[in-house]
Amino acid sequence: LEPTELFKRSLGLETDVVSKEMYTLDTGADGDNKCLRPEATASTVRAFIENKIQQTLWKVYSWGPMFRHERPQKGRFRQFHQFNLEVIGSDKISEDAQCLKMLDSLFTNFGINEYAIMINFLGTSEERKAYTEKLNKHLDTIVDKICKTCLVRKDKNIMRVFDCKNETCQSLYNDAPKIVDNLGTESEKEWKQLQEQLDLLSVSYTVNPKLVRGLDYYSKTVFEFVSPN
């Protein structure tokens, strides 16, 4: 159990997890509602702060049950176990490359070889804000062609339009501006470094400009391990 407010602040009120998928418990009139944790990063950060951990570089992993209701993703149950790698105290892009290499090695050691690694780079919050304004202008030109779900996301969480499963929408978004083409100098440098380091580590990947992830705290590197079946 965690305070519901923890996830509202960190994940964002308009995310699917907060708006549709959390199991919440009304624990009394004081408004201190609890929920079954839907993910682990916010909980890890809470534990780091509450326990006043002083290490400037804190690397941890965890494994445990998470809970989501309302049409969970394909292949995921309402209670599922999640493995987490967290690094607190460093903004080096090499940490992202290391996490990807570790996960790639983990799957290999498990004998799982049929997957593809998709990566993208979201830049800083300021760069994303500028990009979303450009994306919004583009969507205005095709607003009569996109689905109802994308119309809602356009106003509430615009980058989530790229998660749409509608084939017509996906085809239209092929012409949308790419966030990696709208990065600042430092972010562009980090994006290049990430790809170079993955190449050096022999991690095979595909750049997917539509990969954005669904939580508000995401910035810079985003990735998914995708199964063909």
PLM regions: where:
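TRNA-recognition modules of translation machinery and tRNA-sensing kinases, especially anticodon-binding
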Residues: 1-229
